[in-house]
Amino acid sequence: MYGRYINITYKCLVYMKNNPKKLDELDNRLLKELVKNSKRSYRTLAKDIGMSTTAIIERVRSLEDSGYITGYGCRVDYQKLGFEFMAIVEISIFGKDLLQIEGKVARIPHVAAVWDTTGNYDAIAIIMCKTRGELSATVKKILSISGVEKTNTNMVLNVVTRLTEFEEV
């Protein structure tokens, strides 16, 4: 009996992930508030939005089950931690193993993010280092990966906004 229940639950979750619910104005407002500060209690969130705590909990769970909310985190000031050198590295890749090569880049220490892109370069990596030497070594490690044709490194002067601060919901 339990096996059948688990199987039905799994199928429902898979269906919900593949067929997400349509968002209404309240869902959008809730997402916007959670992007601003996901650490708030459900009670505070309910008060700010003007709904009951139970309704907020149900909506958040529904957004999680539908795949709109994929996790929670915090924003860290990496400069305060000593990461003074941030760079955007554009990567040109030859061959058919694009995703494998991007995966290798992602596993290199100091690589904070890797995006598969279109345009003049096949991928973009964000690198965060404490010293110029670490940055140089990281770019050289990327270039040493078989399949990486060339890179173009852009030093970040100032971070004006972060991707986690994008609130257009």
Tell me the role of every PLM-derived stretch:
Residues 1-169:
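A compositional/biophysical signature of low hydrophobicity enriched in polar/charged and small residues
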